[in-house]
């Protein structure tokens, strides 16, 4: 299973690509693997796990808190901002992950309140919404896997604009008409 941090693109400040990039630079992924997973994980540098046919390495985005602070300043958040991070899991490892993320983001001025969600609460808060404007999610730690090794079964559910809650799991509320067309065309 590939775990990831969803950033709700519908709302500020996460609608700004510079903020999303800053968060990526603010997190020391190698240290996260050591601290939260005791070394039993591998940082991923793309949307598809490296084992998937056709997976493209998009990074790495090295740990660079100075670059993160610069991007936040460019985006209009020189002093950072406050937000909430929900975990879709309430186990010990996930607790370590969100605590680590909270500490890393604090170093660049992003104050994060964390909450580990019980499964029923997660479903209610994440999936039982009327649409993007109704969502209370801002940062969401979750995972996704597909045993078929069909990239469509990864990309469509979590990134296609028609798959936003309450329909399915595009909890980033990512919406890009060109991307949707490419995903749809790839099925033909």
Whereabouts are the PLM-identified features?
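Beta->alpha turn/N-cap motifs
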Residues: 1, 29, 48, 141-146
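Extracellular/periplasmic solute-recognition and catalytic clefts
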Residues: 1-11, 34
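Small-molecule pocket liners
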Residues: 1-5, 45-46, 155, 170
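Short, solvent-exposed beta-strand edge segments and adjacent coil->beta transition regions
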Residues: 2-4, 82, 183
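Append "and occasionally in soluble cytosolic enzymes with long acidic Gly/Pro-rich linkers
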Residues: 14-108, 173-181
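Extracytoplasmic/peripheral linker and loop segments enriched in polar/acidic and small residues
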Residues: 18-21, 33-34, 108-127, 153-188
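Ligand/substrate-recognition segments at binding pockets and active sites
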Residues: 73-146, 157, 171
């Amino acid at each position: 299973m590939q775990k990831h941090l969803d950033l709700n693109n519908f709302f500020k400040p996460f609608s700004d690509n510079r903020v999303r990039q800053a968060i990526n630079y603010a997190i020391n992924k190698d240290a996260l693997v050591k601290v939260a997973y005791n070394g039993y994980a591998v940082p991923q540098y793309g949307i598809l796990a490296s084992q998937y046919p056709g997976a493209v390495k998009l990074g790495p985005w090295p740990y660079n808190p100075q670059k993160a602070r610069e991007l936040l300043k460019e985006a209009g958040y020189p002093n950072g901002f406050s937000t909430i991070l929900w975990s879709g899991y309430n186990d010990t490892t996930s607790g370590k992950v969100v605590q680590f993320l909270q500490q890393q983001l604090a170093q660049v001025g992003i104050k994060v309140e964390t909450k580990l969600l019980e499964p029923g609460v997660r479903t209610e808060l994440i999936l039982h919404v009327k649409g993007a404007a109704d969502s209370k999610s801002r940062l969401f730690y979750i995972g996704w896997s597909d045993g078929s090794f069909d990239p469509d079964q990864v990309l469509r559910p979590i990134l296609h604009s028609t798959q936003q809650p309450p329909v399915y799991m595009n909890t980033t509320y990512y919406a890009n008409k060109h991307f949707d067309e490419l995903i749809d065309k790839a099925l033909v």
